[in-house]
Regions:
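Membrane-interface coil-to-helix junctions
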Residues: 39-93
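Start-transfer (signal-anchor) and selected internal transmembrane alpha helices
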Residues: 1-37, 289-296
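Membrane-interfacial entry segments at the cytosolic side of transmembrane helices
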Residues: 22-25, 209-218, 283-297
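Internal/C-terminal transmembrane anchor helices
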Residues: 287-313, 343, 347
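Membrane-interface micro-motifs in multi-pass membrane enzymes
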Residues: 51-54, 69-73, 117-172, 187-194, ...
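Soluble catalytic regions of membrane-associated enzymes that act on cell-envelope
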Residues: 308-518, 543-564
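Transmembrane alpha-helices of multi-pass, membrane-embedded glycan-processing enzymes
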Residues: 93-107, 154-158
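Transmembrane helices and adjacent periplasmic/lumenal helix-loop junctions
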Residues: 167-214, 219-235
């Protein structure tokens, strides 16, 4: 009796849950989606949203409106750019994006008469949109479509609204002109989404109970304009590179090198989802417990697919966060991001080394050991070259590069991109500008604008470059654009004060710090898009005749990175001539003591090294004699644990770095 009651109790709970999901499923799924989106964008990827906004531009004037809207799918681009500007505030941007996702699910449910019982199906477009945006990754820096972040959600949602609206027309006499007008004008405004919506409208109209002649007429006119409209656009405009791309207008345009299977598949499926629901029929009734399992399984598939298809890379997130901090000139935050990651992965690095050590000890041959080491290399945290150079720049601005340059992990982890994006496209404007090369910064602003269009980011750095080189006329033109934005007009007003009153530049610590490095002939040369190599040569190859103390300080940092003894001593001799040497920075002492012992060309016996420097060097040598180094990668971790914050470790273990 008790067992029977227990089973009845369990069944009643399942029935109650199923009933609640059937009646309130749409709102339950909406709540889950809201939580997921706000956590993802508001917490984990807020810096990513800010960077997306900086790579776009929305101006409040009629010329900008005309330029954008008159292009095919221009209305979609314009509305997308309008919403993209709000990503500058991640909270506002996330709220808008979430509301649009929820509305897309609602309009899908209403348009295609999806029952409350099957409402989980209505959220599939929202999930695909999350996957499309989340799979962009490093293509953020090369994507040529303005407002790409909001284009899928707006294209799908607004086109589905059109399906709902035209489907309300009962008379075939009125629906045929409506389909024709929508197909033509909708395509010009929304591109491929309008074509897909036209197919959906045609299917829904064809399924109605009406005379056969009306059905045939609807079908013929719809097919005619589905083909005719893109062909006319292709022949009358120059916006499309090929006939195929004419049919795909409205889909964010990734370069061939950066396109990926996830992005392409999700985009294609999103377009198809405007057509497939038109064929929707309610799912057959099933038992309550089976229904609950089905809904839970679909929800789990949604969440798992979104997670697996999302581009997740620790270094990518850190690069963007550090880049945003540099834009704000928050140098401490740049260093803190790098330091926090070093500390965060210290425990996992230790576990990875223990695992590596046990596997290597169990290996029988050297080749087997090398294979194990190579396979497990990615188990250890290693910063990218951009992260390292951002951190070094921040230390220069804080004046602590000589004591802290090697206190955080160094390295050169490769990008998780289909094709490597050159560093100069990601950080060229920032590094060149703040290292006193505004002409190069300006050049890369123009290069980016020509290839990918003007955006907030390159407009700002072009403005700063022009102010530093007294090109106030060009700076005024760039500021004229920024003054017509919503979030950047305040910054533009501040910069305009320097144009109107050039004497204020001398009072700006930020500008003066850059100008102190501008002690060279202002001529452009070919950097071959290798920014690290160029900066090393710029600061260490030939010293300018009017070099400043600050120039010699920065030259020392780059000299240490060369790991070249002759380059170090040459820059060191310049440094001691122009800077206070009463308290020699720690890393300079470490390098001098190490190089002096490796090569006897320079007598270091009279140099006043700190006792801690000589003691750490002796300790490093003793540790080296006790721990045989078979390969650098295999022995890195134990040496890093003891000496990771010294130049000795950097010199011996940070090798074979590839710049890009």
């Amino acid at each position: 009796m008790a067992l029977t009651d227990s089973k009845k109790g369990k069944n009643s709970i399942v029935d109650l849950l199923s009933l609640n999901i059937e009646n309130y499923g749409f709102w339950i799924y909406s709540l889950i989606l809201t939580i997921v989106v706000f956590y993802t964008f508001g917490v984990e990827y807020s810096d990513w949203l800010i960077r997306i906004e900086s790579k776009s531009l929305f101006l409040y004037n009629h010329l900008f409106f005309q330029d954008v809207v008159l292009a095919p799918a221009g209305l979609l681009s314009y509305i997308s750019l309008f919403f993209t500007q709000f990503l500058h505030s991640p909270l506002i941007g996330t709220t808008i994006f979430t509301l649009l996702l929820l509305f897309s699910a609602y309009i899908t449910k209403v348009t295609y008469n999806i029952s409350d019982r099957d409402s989980v199906i209505a959220f599939l477009p929202a999930i695909l949109i999350l996957i499309i945006n989340g799979s962009i990754g490093y293509a953020l820096y090369t994507i040529k479509t303005a407002g790409f972040f909001f284009m899928p959600i707006l294209g799908y949602t607004l086109s589905t609204v059109a399906v709902w609206s035209i489907n309300k027309i009962k008379s075939p006499v009125l629906s045929i002109p409506a389909i024709i007008i929508w197909c033509f004008l909708g395509y010009l405004g929304f591109g491929v989404y309008a074509l897909a919506a036209t197919v959906a409208i045609t299917i829904l109209q064809y399924k109605r109970e009406c005379i056969t002649v009306a059905k045939i007429a609807i079908l013929v006119f719809a097919l005619l304009f589905l083909v005719f409209t893109p062909l006319v656009t292709y022949n009358l405009t120059t916006s499309a590179n090929s006939l195929l791309s004419t049919f795909l207008l409205g889909i964010p345009n990734l370069t061939e090198e950066q396109n990926n299977a996830i992005f392409s598949s999700a985009s294609a499926l999103l377009i198809a989802l405007q057509i497939i629901p038109a064929l929707y029929k309610p799912l057959p009734l099933i038992k309550a417990q089976h229904y609950l399992i089905f809904q839970s399984a679909v929800l789990a598939v949604y969440l798992l697919t979104s997670y697996l298809c999302w581009f997740r890379d620790t270094n990518f997130k850190a690069e963007i966060a550090m880049s945003n901090a540099i834009d704000r000139e928050d140098w401490k935050e740049v260093c803190n991001i790098h330091k926090a990651l070093t500390e965060k992965y210290s425990a996992s690095d230790k576990k990875a080394y223990n695992k590596l050590h046990s596997k290597v000890n169990a290996a029988n041959t050297s080749s087997e050991m090398d294979l194990i080491v190579e396979k497990m290399r990615n188990d250890f945290f290693e910063p990218s070259r951009i992260m390292v150079q951002y951190k070094n720049l921040a230390l220069v601005k804080l004046g602590t590069e000589g004591n802290q340059a090697f206190t955080c992990k160094d390295g050169g982890r490769e990008q998780k991109a289909q094709q490597t994006i050159p560093m100069v496209l990601q950080c060229g404007k920032q590094l060149y500008l703040y290292y006193g090369l505004p002409y190069f910064a300006y050049r890369w602003c123009i290069e980016e604008a020509v290839e990918y269009g003007w955006n907030v980011d390159n407009l700002k750095y072009a403005t700063l470059s022009c102010i530093l080189t007294d090109n106030f006329e060009m700076a005024d033109k760039f500021l004229h654009r920024l003054e017509k934005t919503l979030y950047h007009r305040k910054w533009a007003k501040q910069m305009r004060s320097y144009i109107d009153n050039p004497e204020q530049i001398a009072q700006s610590t930020s500008f003066q710090a850059i100008k102190s490095l501008m002690c060279y002939n202002n001529t452009l040369s070919n950097d071959q898009a290798l920014i690290e190599t160029y900066l090393i040569n710029h600061f260490t190859a030939k010293r300018p005749e009017n070099a400043t103390p600050q120039f010699d300080k920065v030259a020392m940092l780059w000299a240490l990175q060369t790991q070249d003894i002759g380059t170090f001593w040459r820059c060191f001799s310049h440094y001691v001539q122009t800077n206070d040497t009463q308290k020699m920075p720690r890393h300079y002492q470490e390098a001098a003591y190490l190089y002096g012992n490796l090569e006897k060309n320079v007598n270091i016996s009279n140099m006043p090294f700190d006792k801690t420097i000589t003691a750490s060097y002796d300790s490093f040598n003793r540790f080296s004699s006790q721990h045989r180094v078979r390969t650098i990668e295999e022995s890195k971790y134990p040496f890093y644990e003891r000496f990771g914050e010294t130049f000795y470790y950097y010199y011996y273990f940070i090798r074979n770095l590839n710049t890009y």
